A protein has these predicted regions:
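Non-transmembrane, aqueous-exposed alpha-helical and coiled segments at domain scale
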Residues: 1-165
Length: 165
């Protein structure tokens, strides 16, 4: 739902939490679409705009101490010679452009996307370190190209302590 909301431009961005008039307008606008889907597609009760506003205002207070201009924050850290650690997950085969479509995730899993997601210029990525398990695992339905079945799979799960994430 996050990526569909983002690209349909009906999601919320953190900065919108801090402008109460804009937030209220956005809540009512978003719920015009969301409530139609909830009621007619999912057969669920509509979301009350005033209740959602109250919840979002609570979230605003929770995140306020941690909100900043991330690009400026990281730029300052780079200029001060600090080390920045970016984390990615899943790997290339789950990337929506380079993975095994349609068994992919919604956002890029490639190391190069780390700079984009963090708001850093790509030339600031000086080193990429990859950490991976000795074997791949996945949850959910869909093809898993390197999947092993039977006794061998059970033995890997037992030794690796992997019951599915």
């Amino acid at each position: 739902p996050f990526y569909s909301d983002k690209y349909a431009k009906i999601g919320f961005q953190v900065n919108e939490l801090f402008d109460d008039e804009l937030l209220k307008e956005k809540v009512y606008h978003v719920l015009e679409t969301k409530n139609i889907l909830l009621e007619h597609l999912y057969h669920k009760d509509p979301i009350n705009p005033e209740e959602l506003l109250a919840t979002l205002r609570e979230y605003r207070e929770m995140v306020a101490p941690y909100v900043c201009d991330v690009s400026a924050y990281l730029d300052k850290a780079i200029k001060e010679g600090k080390t920045i650690l970016l984390e990615g997950q899943l790997g290339t085969l789950k990337d929506p452009d380079h993975g095994i479509y349609p068994m992919v995730t919604s956002s890029s899993t490639l190391a190069a996307y780390g700079a984009i997601g963090a708001g850093l210029p790509p030339y600031e990525i000086k080193e990429i370190v990859t950490v991976c398990k000795a074997y791949s695992s996945a949850v959910g339905a869909g093809a898993f190209v390197s999947e092993i079945f039977g006794d061998e799979a059970d033995e890997l799960r037992r030794r690796g302590g992997d019951g599915g994430e």
